[in-house]
Amino acid sequence: MKDMRWKLAALAAAVLVAACGGESADGPSNKVGINAMVSFGDSLSDIGSYNVGSIAGLGQATGGAGRFTVNATTGGQIWTERIAALLPVPTTCPAQTGLSPSPQTGLTGAPFTAKSGCFNYAQGGSRVTSPYGVNSYLFQAPPFNQINLGAMTKPVKDQMSAHLTASGGSYTGKELVTVLAGANDVFVELGSVAAGAQTPQAAVTNVATAGAELGAYIKSMVVAKGAKQVLVVNMPYVAGTPFG
């Protein structure tokens, strides 16, 4: 955790340096010309994709909910929002919302709905390529028959594709694009090994494949489409988290 705090502090300092330019009446206030943020990933970048139904009700009662953060429930920000504030650029909204919980949970959900003009595509539980993310609604069907939250878990590949569709197939070059993904691939593979469904060696190979795929997607679907400022964040040290 100490290592993660140090990295975030360094990242914030770098953004502050980039944001030191004088503000003009006809453009961004930072020297690199960033005027928007686009985010892809999983729960660590999700700003409310699941803040619907019963989850939204909890939010009304507590001042928060639908966000994966240990920060204050009222006004607590995740890292993408802090970076947006430092640049400064507008904080965007979830590009898709929805939840399809199993009936046994007693929770109500909402249809999966795309949100026009919103460019945070990150969703809790999402993997790099596979749609079968952590707590995915797809696991509710046979042969899995899981009782779970029914998360959308749109994979990062599809998140990037959705943005290209929404933005006319390219980037302006003035966005800060953030990518943080891969942890859920590790978790799913770890669970598969624990269940005896595959060997540790196969799991390591699958995780390496996901990492290579992520790099390829960033090159072909982000950089090659005109993005100039791309921030790819390494996975946190999972062994130092409560899960690890």
Residue ranges and their predicted role:
Residues 20-244:
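Conserved active-site regions of diverse hydrolases
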